[in-house]
Design a protein with these regions (language model features):
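Surface-exposed interaction/gating patches
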Residues: 2-15, 101-184, 223-228
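An amphipathic, aromatic/His-enriched active-site/gating alpha helix that lines ligand/cofactor pockets
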Residues: 16-40, 46-51, 59-100, 145-160, ...
Length: 228
């Protein structure tokens, strides 16, 4: 299964209108035919990164399905979407991603109905890491062998998915880690105090063997996002 990761730079003051357009116009277009399904719609939490930005992650059955989806872009309904979208957003940056072998997120049932979260919208930590040249596979393996068990033990975050960029569709040395925030008070303490007093030998130390550059964003799920 493929995952299309899109970052939408929205026109100032148009974020609510853009979200509604994605929900009512774009999502039905993408999901028509059963080859693809919107998984998450996130907005950047205010004050944590760029202004007026949204991120979507869409599951696509396989490369043949992706080809069919691209071929439909010339249809009248898709052209109408394009005209509407460019009144609401300035740019969109996309990449096709594949699940890491150990990633909890693998294939999903494209026909299954969305499950209601039954609570407030979830908050996610969206980490993008850039491993050293030639270290991509080692970095991904270390995330699964060291970092993933560490999060399971601490229960502050739940790793939902680990995705790598499909060849030819974006930056080679790039990994996206999707983590749902389960314990906000502890995370707020981490923001306030950093890693002071944390035991040595954990991921913050071991991870430097594979990369020393990463970017973190706090994302808030839309209330209507199919997955929370």
């Amino acid at each position: 299964m493929l995952y299309v990761h899109e970052t939408h730079d929205v026109v100032g003051g148009k974020l609510e209108a853009f979200a509604e357009a994605v929900r009512t116009v774009w999502r039905p277009l993408v999901e028509a035919g059963g080859d693809a399904r919107l998984c998450w719609y996130w907005e950047l939490a205010h004050g944590t990164s760029a202004s007026y930005q949204a991120i979507t992650l869409t599951a696509v059955r396989d490369w043949a399905a992706w080809g069919r989806l691209v071929a439909r872009r010339g249809e009248p309904r898709w052209r109408e979407w394009d005209r509407l979208a460019w009144t609401l957003r300035r740019e969109v940056t996309a990449k096709i991603m594949l699940p890491a072998p150990w990633s909890p997120l693998q294939a999903i049932d494209l026909a299954a109905p969305p499950v209601s979260a039954g609570g407030p919208p979830a908050i996610y930590l969206h980490d993008t890491g850039w491993p050293y040249p030639g270290k991509l596979e080692e970095y991904v393996a270390a995330l699964g062998a060291i970092y993933y068990p560490q999060t399971q033990a601490s229960r502050m975050l739940t790793v939902v998915g680990c995705l790598v960029v499909a060849p030819g569709t974006g930056r080679h040395h790039e990994v996206v880690l999707l983590q749902r925030l389960d314990d906000w008070p502890r995370f707020a303490g981490l923001l306030r105090h950093g890693e002071q007093g944390a035991p040595r030998g954990g991921w913050m130390e071991a991870g430097l063997s594979y990369r020393d550059r990463w970017e973190s964003k706090l994302l808030r799920c839309a209330a209507w996002s199919p997955m929370q």
